[in-house]
């Protein structure tokens, strides 16, 4: 998952996708690595029941040479990652989630409100993506080809 600086949207998306099911390896990066995950982001995610990671943000170069089933970009600026990762990605998926800190907000309550609104939008859209693109691939399969519990045995 790629965003501008791996400090807000990408981390939120990682936790949200991981909450939908097992079997996924979800990594995050920014076009440029930011300094640290913002406290308000951690607070909102923890309020929604996530054990939020405060690991240091990293940049796209960390993952550029690896093979990926999906590279998910979360803002138009992050789409430039395709130039760096061509040939090692099976599918690119783009979202356009607004940066809650764009324009420089200094009032703490307003920051939290914007991050909470972003969380709600991301959760809805990422669930739809998971349901339509990933869920079927991650479900256990029986030897008969059924992807849910069957009565073969």
Model-inferred region functions:
Residues 5-7, 76-79:
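Short glycine-rich anion-binding loops that position phosphate/pyrophosphate groups of nucleotides
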Residues 11-13, 38, 79-84, 104:
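Short glycine-/acidic-enriched loop or helix-start segments at secondary-structure transitions
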Residues 81-142:
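Phosphate-binding/catalytic loops
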Residues 68-69:
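Local beta-strand N-terminus motif with an aromatic residue
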Residues 1-62:
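Conserved active-site segments centered on acidic
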Residues 140-153:
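Cysteine-cluster motifs in flexible loop/terminal segments that predominantly coordinate metals
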